[in-house]
């Protein structure tokens, strides 16, 4: 179940009616940039359902949209938003780290110094511009985000 409060905890509303039911909520990540925007990942381990379930809501959970894009069909564990660019999202799955630079339409498997293993936790260290990734049994990794931010910058186009 996913619940939201808009009055400091005075009352709560359930907001998961537009999501697959009977699935574990593996992560919830509110946007730092847009009020009412929230990301959620679910998994179906209990039912041998390893489908990708990653969603966003822009209206406090009244409606949900899949942002699976071109992701492969695999369980996902955590999603977080970048601290500089709201279009960049990081998704930890059972087989590695995926990054989108367009809000979830197109995802790419991170090809850096990170093994393709289950990722269960992530946090951004804004001062250092690093993504800290916690894996299942393969340690903790620190990824410098400067290159990802550079890739996401608009490029000057030259018309011929």
Question: Where do the model's predicted regions map?
Answer:
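Beta-propeller blade termini and top-face loops
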Residues: 1-160
């Amino acid at each position: 179940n996913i619940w939201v409060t808009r009055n400091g905890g005075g009352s709560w509303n359930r907001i998961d009616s537009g999501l697959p039911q009977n699935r574990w909520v593996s992560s919830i990540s509110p946007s730092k940039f847009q009020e009412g925007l929230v990301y959620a990942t679910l998994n179906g381990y209990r039912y041998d359902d390893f489908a990708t379930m990653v969603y966003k809501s822009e209206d406090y959970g009244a409606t949900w949209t899949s942002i699976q894009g071109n992701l492969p069909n695999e369980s996902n564990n955590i999603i977080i938003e970048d601290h500089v660019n709201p279009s960049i999202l990081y998704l930890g799955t059972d087989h590695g780290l995926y990054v989108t630079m367009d809000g979830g339409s197109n995802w790419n498997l991170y090809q850096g110094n990170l093994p393709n293993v289950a990722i269960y936790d992530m946090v951004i260290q804004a001062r250092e511009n690093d993504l800290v990734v916690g894996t299942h049994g393969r340690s903790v990794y620190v990824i410098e985000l400067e290159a990802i931010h550079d890739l996401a910058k608009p490029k000057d186009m030259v018309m011929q």
